[in-house]
């Protein structure tokens, strides 16, 4: 299960077999599932409009879309994509949580190095004050203690075979 932004399917080309890519995840407690998941939970019945309930105090989710199963050469293999709209942790303006993966669509010809060169200033501006507030340390003190913070860009096409970053969904290669 992946909690995703309503724009997820406008970034990733996972066409919906059923449902509308533009509206499937706009409402809270909506979910798009794979064909295999639809068959697993609903047999031969149409999954659209049905409800999936989860443990661990998560709400029930209404099926608003069905996609083909994720290809084997993808860097993620989730079988359910639930809307994070209305999900309380997603409303936080804290930059301290590392629990989100962010994908960017860049214009053709974008200079990756120039864009990455702006990231340290973002860390200083947005994370520095939060580290000070939450930990009582300046950003430099935080780093002196062996911690690191930063962002890097990686082309989506290189993740499956070549990624060696920490906390990937699956090992590269």
Residue ranges and their predicted role:
Residues 2-18, 29-172:
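Mid-to-C-terminal secondary-structure elements
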Residues 22-26:
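Glycine-rich loop motifs involved in handling phospho/adenylate chemistry
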């Amino acid at each position: 299960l992946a909690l995703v932004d309503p724009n997820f399917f406008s970034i990733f080309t996972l066409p919906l077999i059923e449902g509308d890519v533009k509206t499937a995840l706009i409402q809270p407690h909506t979910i798009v599932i794979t064909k295999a998941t639809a068959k697993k939970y609903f047999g031969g019945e149409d999954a659209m409009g049905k409800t999936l309930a989860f443990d661990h105090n998560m709400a029930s989710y209404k099926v608003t879309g069905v996609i083909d199963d994720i290809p084997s050469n993808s860097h993620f293999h989730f079988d359910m994509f639930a809307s994070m709209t209305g999900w309380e942790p997603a409303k936080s303006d804290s930059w301290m949580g590392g629990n989100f993966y962010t994908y960017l669509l860049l214009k053709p010809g974008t200079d990756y190095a120039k864009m990455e060169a702006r990231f340290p200033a973002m860390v200083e501006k947005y994370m520095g004050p939060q580290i000070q507030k939450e930990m009582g340390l300046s950003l430099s003190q935080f780093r002196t203690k062996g911690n690191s913070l930063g962002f890097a860009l990686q082309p989506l096409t290189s993740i499956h075979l070549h990624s060696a970053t920490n906390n990937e969904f699956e090992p590269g290669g």
